[in-house]
Design a protein with these regions (language model features):
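Alpha-helix-loop-beta-strand connector modules within alpha/beta enzyme cores
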Residues: 1-18, 37, 42-61, 89-117, ...
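A generic short-segment signal for beta-strand/edge and adjacent turn/coil regions
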Residues: 1-4, 25-26, 78-80
């Protein structure tokens, strides 16, 4: 499946980032990987993947963000901002902590977790680079419309 998805993302010049699985990322020559706190350490992934691949990391605290950056992460996913159905065991991250992380690291920070068009306003003036959204798009009757609405809403508050 990852090979098929990668062919599609390449068609539109969009990087494919594989969540958690460095082996799958390598097998399909994906542009990068995103690593959670319980996945392979960022510094080891960087040694394996090299400097040209994108490595994202999850951070819930400023110390985790600083460590990920020091170990070679290119970007951070911070959250969950709200409860989410995609991660059963997750700890919520406050918007204040999100802002502190943005100020602490010089790499893009993206908010994640339970975000949708009705609650994304909470991220205004946080300095984040973007948002990561799954359920609000995948569970929508019209996923394309849902994605467009979230994109427009985020652009308005950024």
């Amino acid at each position: 499946m990852a090979e098929k998805v990668h062919k599609l993302t390449q068609k539109y010049n969009i990087p494919l980032i594989i969540d958690d699985r460095i082996d799958v990322a390598m097998a399909v020559n994906a542009e990068g990987v995103h690593l959670g706190q319980s996945d392979m350490p960022v510094d080891i992934a960087r040694k394996i993947l090299g400097k040209d691949k994108i490595i994202g990391a999850t951070a819930k605290t400023v110390p985790q963000a600083l460590e990920a950056y020091a170990n070679g992460a290119d970007n951070l996913g911070v959250g969950a901002i709200y409860p989410t159905t995609t991660k059963v065991k997750t700890v919520l991250t406050s918007v204040d902590t999100l802002k502190e992380i943005v100020k602490a690291v010089p790499i893009p920070v993206n908010a994640i977790g339970g975000l949708n068009k009705n609650n994304i306003d909470i991220l205004e003036n946080t300095g984040i680079a973007g948002v990561c959204v799954v359920s609000a798009i995948m569970k929508a009757d019209n996923p394309q419309k849902a994605a467009e609405e979230i994109k427009e809403k985020f652009a308005a508050i950024k």
